[in-house]
Amino acid sequence: MKSVEINDLLSYHFYGNLKVKDGVKVFVDGVAAEKDNAYEYTLKCVKDDKVYDLTSFGKEAGFYIENENSVLFCGNRKNIEKSTSLYRLALNGGEAKEIARFDKPGMNVLGYLNENTLVLMTKEKLVEEESDYEVFDEIPFYMNGQGITNKHRMHLYTYNLDTKELVCVTEGTFDVSNAKIHDGALYYTGQNWTRKQALYENLYKYDGSVSTVVDAKERSIQSFDFMDGKLVLIASTHEKYGLNENPK
């Protein structure tokens, strides 16, 4: 048996973020980019039991299947500083078409809130400072998969394709951890925090105004989804437990 070498890991393909809609199957193929200490991502489509590359830029990790003919994704192909573009790409071939540009980096499209309004999400820095060092004064200040989180918050936006208006749903120190669109409304978990992040997050609903759906109280909502018209939560009380241990 051969031992596993670094080159084996660098050539390994990480598949994820599979989405299926209207018979369309799209997923992300990630490969390590050693020189950049990062990953290169490619959107791939499964059609007639064959896999096709949709993108080749190496930066597209998030996307939304618009219909059986096209997908939406965000990127910065023109390398404009502090900017994100929204692209539409036909599944039957052709170049991605830019349909919007935002003066915010790292935007990711979640889907349609209604027929002319999209929901987007991005990680934003609370205070813009030009400095050659970083002051960590929040807990947590770093998280695996996210990088530095100190003085950064995940924010939600809506974008009207007709009026070109970008509206911030959550702002300031509010931090979004999970978001889904269901039945014409935006549901998300998160909390407003400074200095130290709490364990418990509420579930909110946005349909033009914000309302609280579930008050977490003593339970931390890890994830949520909708099944057969019902809201399903995975939550934790953060009580200590061990193998075969009953907390009662």
What is the role of each PLM region?
Residues 18-24, 63-70, 109-117, 178-185, ...:
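Blade-terminus and WD-like Trp-Asp/Gly-His loop motifs, strongest in beta-propeller folds
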Residues 1-13, 48-49, 166-168:
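A short helix->beta-strand "capping" segment at the edge of beta-propeller domains
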Residues 93-96, 105-107:
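Repeat-solenoid scaffold signature
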